[in-house]
UniProtKB/Swiss-Prot annotation:
This is Uncharacterized protein YaaL. It comes from the Bacteria. It comes from Bacillus subtilis (strain 168). The lineage of its organism: Bacteria, Bacillati, Bacillota, Bacilli, Bacillales. InterPro entries: DUF2508 (IPR019644).
Length: 74
């Protein structure tokens, strides 16, 4: 009984993790484009870029640690 529940929870968490990973990648790319298009990016915009980058790499490390196989890498 407990084993099946554990497997289901792991699969649900893995799906949420991959979803968050892709969302964060899109956010990071959006922030990068905003900085590239800006003549003089403000400190706040640069801060948001660093935060988005840190979150993306955190999710990426977590996915690698959990040995996720993601079939739709963008």
């Amino acid at each position: 009984m407990g084993f099946l529940r554990k497997k289901t929870l792991r699969r649900e968490f893995d799906e949420k993790l991959t979803e968050q990973l892709f969302k964060q990648k899109e956010e990071w790319n959006r922030q990068k484009k905003l900085v590239e298009k800006s003549l003089e990016p403000s400190a706040e915009v640069l801060y948001e870029l660093k935060v988005a980058e840190a979150k993306y790499f955190f999710y990426l490390r977590e996915a690698k640690q959990r040995n996720l196989k993601i079939s739709r890498w963008k």
